[in-house]
Structure formats: structure tokens, C-alpha cells
């Protein structure tokens, strides 16, 4: 069964006797006929002549639906071509099998940076128009508004704007760095000084702690001025002699200070009597010793 469009009365069908050779159809790509009778090739853009004709008819006031019927191009294709022309000013299609050619060249980016530096409040569409007026870019390769906004937001672009201020700050930075090196000693000397200081502090802390321990371990012995009494003697904390120890049977003033006590006879556990010293008696004391 033959296709229903086999005898389609348009010379654009390849089987028609009035069909003219089209180089776009010679590579074996899949071709088809749209609802209006026009031939299209999948994956291939519309011819530049047809694109220019669509734009020309639109500028003369023809509606997109009428352009679609007259040129036998789908309405979606016409709308896409016109939208691309109004946004970029170009009717050329994108590169087949790759990305679009780069329009944001270093020269264009530098010019955008100059415009933005001279007038920070300039809008993207004003920058785009300025590029065209200064003949830096043409209608076909001028960056779009979104591309200009992306360039302005880029970090490298902001660094390029801040380049004049960074040069002045870097010129003042070496003088401060040299003065810092002149004031501060080398790192090795600083480390040696810190180590010696820490060792000295540790030694001083050890000496202080040793003196504190000695003062706590040694009981205070305060001698009364002009007398031979001591605190231990006044408090009566002398060791008690025992009957089993022979060396305490014969009391000797050389072995112990017996100036505060006297014996009542035999030396026993309860035979030691405390003598009240004169130095601690009150002034109105009149008793007998």
C-alpha cells in the first residue's frame, strides 16, 4: 500500500516529476512533509534564505500564521525564528552538533568592564546597544542581555573592576611588611626566647613550691624575748617519759628543757607538774608560785 501523500500535488515531494535537487536531502537524512506541504529534514536547520524571508515578511506586517501558510513552514518554526531574531538580532541557526560560537571574547569582556567602570548604573541592554554603536560587535555576534548580565556577575569580572584599587593597596603593602620584619626578630630567635622564658618560669615555680612545703612541714618556734622559754614548753607538749625507759629515770637538763616542770619525787606518769611562767601572768596576779 502506497502512502497517502504519494501523489501529493506539490513539487517539493522528492517523487514528484517537477522536484528540484536539494543538497540538504542528498545525505540520506530522514525527510518528511509537514501539514502545509513543506519538506523538512530532521536535525537540520531551515535554509538561510527562508529565514531571511520570514523576517522580511514580519517586518512588513505579515502575521506569523500567514507567513506559515505562504512559505509552508510550521507555525512553531516561524515563531522560534522571529523570537531568536528579536532577542539576538541574528537569523543564523546554531552550530550543528556543537555549541554556538563564543561571542564573549576577551575584547568584548574588556569593553563591557570599561562601560561598567565608567557608569556602574548602566543596564545590560544599554551595554549591548553601546557595543553595536561603537562597532565592537555586529548585529550577528553581539552578546545577548542574559550573557552580559552573566559576565557582569562573574567573579573574574568583579576582580577586573577592582584591579585599579588592588594595585594601590599592593604598593603600600611592601612598606608595612618591611617595617614588620625590621621590628620583629627571626622566627628561630623568637622560639628560643620563648623556650628560655618558659624554663625560667618553671624553675621559679619549683623553688616557690619547695619553700612553701618546707614552711608547712617545719613547726614555728617563737622564742620569747629575753627568756629561755619556747612555745612547745609553754603549751606543755613535751614527750611524757616512761618508767620502762632507763634514760628518763635520771633527769638531765642537757637532754630536755626542764625549766617549766619539776618533779614531786619519784618519776611517774602523773608526777609532772606544770609551772606557770612569769611572762604570761597578768599584771595584777598576786598568787604564789
From Swiss-Prot:
Task: Look up keyword DNA-binding and say if it applies.
Answer: yes
Residues in the DNA-binding region annotation = 29-155
Q: Carries keyword NAD?
A: no
Q: What InterPro entries is this protein classified in? A: Homeodomain-like_sf, PAIRED_DNA-bd_dom, Paired_dom, PAX_fam, WH-like_DNA-bd_sf
Membrane spanning stretches: none
Q: Which SMART domains has this protein been placed in?
A: PAX (SM00351)
Q: Which UniProt keywords apply?
A: Chromosome, Developmental protein, DNA-binding, Nucleus, Paired box, Transcription, Transcription regulation
Question: Span of the secretion signal?
Answer: none
Protein's cellular compartments: Nucleus; Chromosome
* Domain of life where this protein originates: Eukaryota
Location of the region described as RED subdomain in the Swiss-Prot/TrEMBL record: 107-155
Q: What is its main location?
A: nucleus
Mark out the compositionally biased spans (Low complexity): 166-179, 189-198
Region Disordered: list its residue ranges. Answer: 166-198
Known outcome of mutating residue 37 to S: In sy287; abnormal tail in males. Normal egg-laying by hermaphrodites when grown at 15 degrees Celsius, but defective at 25 degrees. Mostly normal morphology in vulval cell vulF. Reduced expression of lin-48 in hindgut cells
Q: Pfam families from the xrefs?
A: PAX (PF00292)
Stretch list, region PAI subdomain: 32-88
Mutating residue 57 to I has which effect?
In gu22; abnormal tail in males. Almost normal egg-laying by hermaphrodites. Mostly normal morphology in vulval cell vulF. Reduced expression of lin-48 in hindgut cells. Reduces DNA binding ability in vitro
Which GO terms of the molecular function aspect are on file? Answer: DNA-binding transcription factor activity; DNA-binding transcription factor activity, RNA polymerase II-specific; RNA polymerase II cis-regulatory region sequence-specific DNA binding; RNA polymerase II transcription regulatory region sequence-specific DNA binding; sequence-specific DNA binding
A GO biological process this protein is involved in?
Answer: vulval development
One cellular component term from this protein's GO annotations in UniProt: nucleus
**Function noted in UniProt:** Transcription factor. Binds to specific DNA sequence motifs in regulatory elements, for example in the genes encoding transcription factor lin-48, apoptosis regulator ced-9 and neuropeptide-like protein nlp-2. Specifies cell fate, playing an essential role in embryonic and larval development. Involved in morphogenesis of the vulva and uterus in hermaphrodites and of the rectal epithelium of the tail in males. Plays multiple roles in the development of the egg-laying system, acting in both lin-3/EGF-pathway-dependent and -independent processes.
Q: What is this protein called?
A: Paired box protein 5 homolog
UniProt organism field: Caenorhabditis elegans
Task: Write the gene name.
Answer: egl-38
Amino acid at each position: 500500500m502506497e502512502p497517502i501523500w504519494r501523489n501529493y500535488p506539490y513539487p517539493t515531494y522528492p517523487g514528484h516529476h517537477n522536484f528540484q535537487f536539494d543538497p540538504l536531502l542528498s545525505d540520506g537524512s530522514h525527510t518528511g512533509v509537514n501539514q502545509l506541504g513543506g519538506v523538512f529534514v530532521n536535525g537540520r536547520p531551515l535554509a538561510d534564505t527562508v529565514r531571511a524571508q520570514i523576517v522580511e515578511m514580519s517586518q512588513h506586517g505579515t502575521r506569523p500564521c500567514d507567513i506559515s501558510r505562504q512559505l509552508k513552514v510550521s507555525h512553531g518554526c516561524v515563531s522560534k525564528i522571529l523570537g531568536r531574531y528579536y532577542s539576538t538580532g541574528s537569523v543564523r541557526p546554531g552550530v550543528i552538533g556543537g555549541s554556538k560560537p563564543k561571542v564573549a571574547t576577551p575584547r568584548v569582556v574588556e569593553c563591557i568592564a570599561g562601560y561598567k567602570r565608567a557608569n556602574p548604573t548602566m543596564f545590560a541592554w544599554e551595554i549591548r546597544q553601546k557595543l553595536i554603536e561603537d562597532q565592537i560587535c555586529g548585529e550577528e555576534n553581539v552578546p545577548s542581555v542574559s550573557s552580559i548580565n552573566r559576565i557582569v556577575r562573574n567573579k573574574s569580572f568583579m576582580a577586573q573592576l577592582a584591579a585599579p584599587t588592588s594595585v594601590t593597596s599592593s604598593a603600600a603593602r611592601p612598606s608595612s611588611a618591611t617595617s614588620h620584619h625590621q621590628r620583629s626578630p627571626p622566627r628561630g630567635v623568637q622560639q628560643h626566647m620563648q623556650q628560655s622564658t618558659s624554663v625560667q618560669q618553671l624553675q621559679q615555680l619549683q623553688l616557690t613550691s619547695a619553700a612553701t612545703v618546707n614552711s608547712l612541714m617545719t613547726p614555728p618556734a617563737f622564742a620569747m624575748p629575753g627568756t629561755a622559754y619556747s612555745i612547745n614548753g609553754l603549751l606543755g607538749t613535751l614527750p611524757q617519759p616512761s618508767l620502762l625507759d632507763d634514760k628518763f629515770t635520771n633527769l638531765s637538763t642537757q637532754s630536755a628543757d626542764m625549766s617549766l616542770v619539776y618533779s614531786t619525787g619519784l618519776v611517774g606518769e602523773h608526777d609532772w607538774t606544770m609551772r606557770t611562767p612569769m611572762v604570761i601572768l597578768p599584771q595584777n596576779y598576786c598568787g604564789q608560785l
